Amino acid sequence: VTFSSEKGTRCIRTGNSGYRDMDSSRQQRDFYRLGHSLTVFPVVHESGDYALSVRREMLSGHYDCLAVALPPSFQEPVIQGIERLPEISAVMQREQGDPDAVNYVPIDPCQGMIMGIRIALQENIACEFIDMEVDVYEVYEGTFPDPYALKRIPGEPFLAAILPTLSRPEPESRRERRIAYMACRLRELEEEYKDILFLCSVMDWPWVRDAYLLQTPCPEPSLQAAPAHGPSARLFRVSAATLYFMLGEIPFITYLYEKSREDLTSDENLSIDGVKELLIEARRRWVVKHNITQHHLNPQVLQAYMKYVRNLTLMDRRFTPDLYTLTVAAKQVGGDSFAVSLVETAKDFPYQTQDQEGYDTVAFGMGRGEMADGEVVSLKNRLAGERKVWRTLPLRSEPEVRKQKLWKYFWDPYGQCSWTPEDRKIESFNLHVREQARALIGEDLARS
């Protein structure tokens, strides 16, 4: 197995396609086991494919307790948010050490930790939130292989590829104290439950394991943090227009995961099949919006589009495309108007309604958010995955209907003029350039 962190490499290559057959269920258990009653399952956040791995692990075991790396102050509102799914929400908490900052837990069905809690509630499994309350939360982001690889290889080589890239926590840092605290809580839970599954970030997994095996002393809670259960955490509705900035997957793909759950259909390959459904839906909306009876986006063109997306994705060293890659290909194949239609479709999440009362709405951005009262705060995601970056793609959007009417109203056909001799020279020059180009192409073909 090879993995490179250069330029965000996320691909795993294996030389033996039958590697999965070499792995047994017992070996998997031993790999994740820490004690006779404790299993640690590291999670790559913001990935629908990895969330499915969490679901498979929970349903294949006989666990009587699920422990998650979240503070107790988040437990009640997180469970409330999960019960409101498929509507997307977020549990937010003010930081005592930084009044302008808010840390939050996205109630995203494509988050592995949310999937685990959801299955625990469904299967009546006890759920324990064991992270330490802190006055200031520090966000940890990394670069990981594409979790789509888990459909072909077991989790062990996948995690082994990530392990060399993980950095050890700084001594006496908040992160080190949190890890030691969680290891201490796991030892306490072992006295109460027979079979525990612990979900934590893949970036904390090796160090929690070390702290547990070395029996690191339990640190004292932060003096600046609120006692017992920490500062209050509240549940907020997320603005439908800003879901893309909060969800780990494309909103339309997340919708397909929830629709598959509702319809009891398979969702194992939605990370790829969902792209095809997104493309077909974007084309349908594009045809309806522009009232087109005949267009060039036939199945052959869409097949060429998918090949183009595949090539761009592999050039980015990924297995699954992101929205930027899909939009670039849509612009090249279908034009700006089709690319705009695809972006608008990708941002759509039909389950997100705004008619329920009881909790406020927050708008998300890149690291910033606008609260219900208009206050702009800095946001810290407790379930952060890979780093997000801005990338610019110029698109010409369709003019507004009002502007179209104004242009039509003020158009003066008698205000335009054309001089025939000049037009003939321009057209003849264009014809001359085309003929010369054809001649050069013909000569090149003759030489070859």
Language-model-detected regions and their locations in the chain:
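Compositional signal for N-terminal targeting/processing segments
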Residues: 11-448
